[in-house]
Swiss-Prot record:
Catalytic activity: a 1,2-diacyl-sn-glycero-3-phosphoethanolamine + S-adenosyl-L-methionine = a 1,2-diacyl-sn-glycero-3-phospho-N-methylethanolamine + S-adenosyl-L-homocysteine + H(+)
Gene Ontology molecular function: phosphatidylethanolamine N-methyltransferase activity
Pfam families registered for this protein in UniProt: PEMT
Residues on Lumenal side: 1-85, 131-195, 245-277, 322-397, 441-482, 528-562
Protein name per its UniProtKB record: Phosphatidylethanolamine N-methyltransferase
GO cellular component: cortical endoplasmic reticulum; endoplasmic reticulum membrane; perinuclear endoplasmic reticulum
Length: 971
């Protein structure tokens, strides 16, 4: 409900970002950028009403009638009422009567539980329904299975009374442009879903207000002035919240308000207007300001804490439900660029920023570095716990120095002298972080001083860039580490949390710290590693600016929101010294933006810089004319002042020494869950009517080169074990390629359950042959379509219920059989080596009717003895089919030739790169990070990297055919 969404074209941005992201071809549509005019009445130039058309996933086009918001439907006398409206109003009335009838001591706990129930129904209940509808089309499939929208006249609807009730309810609400019988099932399902949403949302809000009433009171010894200020601030926040909701509904209408794009899309242009231009996710961010206004008016910490809990739950709903659906629906990966001929491949490769494989490894000149003008690909990032690498000097020194800082902080006494030292240390690091780093960047912008220094000693610009990232990274972390240490020294644990505003100060301070963390994460997501480290000071990037994420709303989010945490520390500590550090930090940050970033951006991008961000434009439109003129005068005054200070600094700018390094990130341990979940299954009572001989599974796949015979002749076995296997009529072992699709042919009785399913398991997972006691973890396919609410379980069905006459049975039985085929591929496979089996299960349960022959998934190791590893061509030929399997053989992802670049989805979904690096490790014994696969971008480049890595590591590898010591070359 936080965004308006529609199909059609989207409005172009003004072009915005304070630091450009490297190698960004285009700005992807983001949730906050997507708003739709909805299904409200539109008019063309002649004043004639325009229809809104919807489109179902199946391609059906229909007219979307006009609907109204839930409050108008329920409370407006002009709107027609139906039975569901009466039910909702009655339930709301029960809530109000309950508040009136409960004893005083029970009101608060009872309504706290009631509100938490409705909030869980909203975020968990509706979230679960929408998640399943988005991924599996569950709600529509429920409607199809129950046939509640099928006309009873056909004789196929088992619920004719329910059909008439729903028909009357919906047609009462939509008197025009709507026919219940002719509307698509997706639209009718959405309308029924809306009524459930109306009930939950209304009860959620009303129960919250009643809980606030139950908790409300006036603090002891509160003066009249404080009471007036508290109520005034609360009313302002509530009115602001009301405006946000009304303006958001004006923009998105009912279609997006009720998550209509989970069911169908509308053919209409996207707009970017109103509150959606002010803040990201306005319905879930500033749209909850009223909760805190009500908390102020109630003067209750209980209401405040339950408001924070509800707000956090709403953000979880956004992250886990809405954003994944928006990305899937509106931000699909762009179509891949296919190569036309070998010449174009070569030309494209030379222009790429990915590592390029030379024609021969011997042609490389180790002492003649290449000075590429473009930025290097981001493979080994610095930021984030997931990127912590103790083999890297930057990370190791960060952890050691950080540990030292906090050890000194904890072990030293909090005397005035030590407090002074810690505050002075924090101030020095802040000055270095803003002034020192600013001076380095200014010289780099004007004279390329940093890069020139490294080129002077024969290094490349890429090496200068890497060293700069380490310097900036350590300076940043040391700045904040020293600030946290100073806060620790100045903080005194409260003796009484209930005294005065102590608790409120801590809550607000924690909120501001959280805001700064969110702002930093948003900035990093928008800019990437390149923009975060000011990459356009070091490399010539594209002259076009793109604005997305938080930069859609703010030109410099670090100017205010990026320092919210330091002011949160001021609130928590109530210390004058920390207030001084906060003022110093804010002043230096503003100066850095004005004197370092702004001149460089103007020089680099000129007039393409956007003057006003989305929030600024919205505020200017809302201001009266006198205030607009005052705003312009204030801006001019600040500009003149900054120009004067800049001229003064230019005349006497000190040279600051390069600083100390630190950055601490806690190591994260990866815990692998046991890949199976134990379940309790019950044997079906109707199994007696089925003969297990009628069930069978036959497996077919792409054969892999088996190493079994090689292992037998290795000399490690006894004499008898070295002899060839005497199979005595048994079939050859099944060994399939890693990641190749596996076809399963099944047979079952003609009267088999339509909910039968086939699952893929490790042989060692199940000890029982009668019941599968382990979850398939999504690796299963139904035998028949339309039997499950989950549409993904039908992906892979080839044929179903093809009759095999009894005359064609090999076992001589006289009964006809049903047969079918399914194909397991992609996420339905195990992406590892091992021995596996398929199991045929009965009637949606875990009773096993048949088990396939066990088969092995094996990655053939590259034979370095027969084929020289230094030959990239042979490596390419061995690697190419494996890479295609890792990419699911999807034509939009998998390459058709070794030179063709990978599809863009490889960049977005990390599982594909992880599959490839696992295969490379097994084939060649070389371990790469997944980012290497993304950076190389083709089999050709990856093969060259493997050869180069093998050559580098060769002196440390034990060869198969000789000693590890060097040998003389043969003449």
């Amino acid at each position: 409900m936080d965004r308006g969404l529609s199909t059609g074209t989207h409005q172009e941005d003004d072009g915005l970002r304070e630091r450009i992201v490297a190698s960004q071809s285009g700005a992807a549509l983001t949730p906050e950028a997507l708003t739709a005019t909805g299904e409200g009445l539109l008019k063309d130039k002649t004043g004639k009403e325009m229809k809104t058309y919807g489109r179902t996933p199946g391609g059906t086009v229909f007219t979307v009638p006009q609907t109204h918001d839930m409050v108008s439907q329920l409370l407006s006398p002009s709107e027609p009422k139906n039975l569901s409206d009466v039910a909702v109003i009655a339930i709301l009335g029960v809530h109000i009567l309950l508040l009136w009838g409960l004893p005083a001591g029970a009101k608060v706990p009872v309504f706290a539980l009631i509100y938490l129930f409705w909030r869980a129904a909203y975020n968990a209940g509706i979230g679960w329904l929408l998640h399943n509808q988005s991924n599996y089309n569950t709600l529509v499939r429920w409607a199809e299975k129950t046939k509640i929208f099928v006309n009873p006249a056909t004789g196929k609807n088992p619920h004719p009374n329910l059909y008439q009730l729903i028909k009357r309810e919906l047609e009462t609400k939509i008197p025009t442009d709507y026919s219940f019988e002719n509307a698509p099932i997706e639209y009718n399902t959405w309308l029924v879903f809306r009524r459930l949403v109306d009930l939950i949302l209304m009860c959620d809000f009303v129960s919250y207000c009643l809980f606030a009433v139950a908790c409300s009171g006036r603090p002891v010894d509160e003066g009249a002035l404080m009471t007036v200020l508290r109520w005034s601030a609360g009313i302002v926040l509530v009115l602001f919240n009301l405006w946000v909701k009304l303006d958001a509904h004006r923009v998105v209408k009912d279609y997006a308000w009720y998550w209509g794009d989970f069911f169908f899309l509308i053919d209409q242009e996207l707009t970017f207007d109103g509150v959606f231009e002010m803040a990201p996710h306005p319905m879930y961010s500033v749209g909850y300001a009223g909760y805190y206004g009500i908390s102020l008016m109630a003067a209750s910490y209980k209401v405040l804490f339950i408001s924070i809990l509800a707000h956090a739950a709403q953000f979880a709903f956004l992250v886990f439900v809405e954003n994944p659906h928006i990305d899937k629906t509106y931000n699909p990966p762009p179509p891949r660029k296919r190569t036309i001929d070998q010449e174009s491949v070569s030309a494209a490769s030379q222009a790429s920023s990915s590592p390029i494989a030379p024609a021969s490894l011997d042609e490389q000149l180790p002492h003649a570095p290449s000075y590429a003008s473009g930025p290097p690909p981001s493979v080994h990032n610095l930021l984030g716990i997931q990127n912590l690498d103790l083999h890297r000097i930057t990370d190791t020194s960060s952890m050691l120095i950080q540990f030292l800082v906090f050890a000194i902080t904890v072990l030293t006494p909090s005397t005035p002298w030590y407090r002074f030292l810690f505050v002075a240390n924090a101030a020095i690091w802040r000055i270095w972080y803003s002034v020192g780093i600013g001076l380095v960047l200014d010289r780099q912008s004007n004279r390329k001083a940093w890069t020139r220094h490294f080129v002077k000693y024969g290094e490349t610009p890429q090496e200068a860039w890497n060293q700069w990232k380490g310097t900036y990274h350590l300076s940043m972390v040391m700045c904040y580490a020293s600030f946290i240490a100073a806060v620790w020294k100045m903080y005194t644990f409260p003796a009484d949390w209930g005294y005065g505003l102590v608790l409120l100060r801590h809550v607000l301070g924690a909120g501001l710290i959280s805001l700064q963390i969110w702002t930093s994460v948003s900035i990093y997501e928008s800019l990437g590693e390149f923009g975060w480290f000011y990459g356009d000071f070091f490399f010539d990037a594209s002259p076009k600016l793109t604005y997305n994420g938080i930069y859609r709303f703010l030109n410099n989010p670090e100017r205010v929101l990026g320092l919210a945490g330091v002011w949160g520390a001021v609130l928590i500590t109530s210390s004058g010294a920390i207030t001084f550090l906060a003022l110093l930090s804010h002043t230096l940050t503003l100066a850095f933006i004005q004197f370092v970033e702004r001149p460089h951006m103007q020089k680099l991008y000129g007039r393409s810089l956007r003057r006003d961000a989305g929030l600024t434009k919205s505020l200017k439109r809302s201001l009266p004319d006198p205030l607009k003129q005052l705003h312009g005068s204030v801006d001019k005054m600040f500009d003149d002042s900054f120009e004067f200070i800049e001229d003064l600094i230019d005349t006497a700018r000190p040279k600051l020494a390069a600083g100390v390094n630190t950055f601490v990130k806690d190591t994260s341990a990866l815990f692998q869950k046991y890949p199976a979940r134990v379940t309790i299954s019950r044997i079906d009572e109707d199994l007696a009517g089925y003969d297990s001989r009628d069930y069978s599974l036959e497996v077919e796949g792409t054969d892999s080169l088996s190493l079994h015979d090689v292992d037998q002749s290795s000399g490690r076995e006894g004499l008898n074990a070295r002899m060839p296997l005497d199979r005595r009529g048994d079939l050859k072992n099944l060994v399939f390629e890693y990641g190749s699709p596996i076809k399963v042919k099944w047979t079952a009785p003609l009267n088999h359950s339509k909910k039968d399913w086939i699952g893929l398991y490790r042989v060692i997972d199940n000890t029982s042959r009668e019941i599968s006691r382990v979850s398939s973890q999504g690796r299963w396919i139904a035998t028949n379509e339309g039997s499950y609410d989950n549409s993904k379980c039908e992906q892979g069905i080839v044929t179903s219920d093809v009759v095999i006459p009894a005359s064609q049975r090999k076992d001589g039985e006289g009964r006809d059989l049903a047969s079918g085929e399914v194909v397991f591929s992609g996420d339905k496979l195990f992406w590892t080596q091992g021995v596996f089996e398929f199991r045929y299960h009965h009637n949606g349960k875990h009773n096993v009717m048949s088990i396939s022959r066990p088969f092995e998934i094996r990655i053939s190791r590259f034979d370095e003895d027969e084929i020289p590893l230094m030959d990239p061509t042979s490596v390419e030929m061995s690697l190419f089919p494996v890479v295609r399997n890792c990419f699911d053989r999807d034509p939009e992802i998998a390459p058709e030739t070794v030179d063709e670049p990978f599809g863009s989805l490889v960049e977005r979904d990390g599982k594909y790169a992880k599959r490839v690096v696992f295969a490379v490790h097994q084939m060649f014994g070389i371990e790469f990070a997944p980012e290497v696969v993304k950076a190389d971008g083709s089999v050709h480049n990856l093969a060259w990297r493997i050869c180069n890595a093998k050559r580098v590591l060769a002196p440390y590898s034990m060869p198969k055919n000789g000693a590890a010591t060097p040998t003389e070359a043969k003449e």
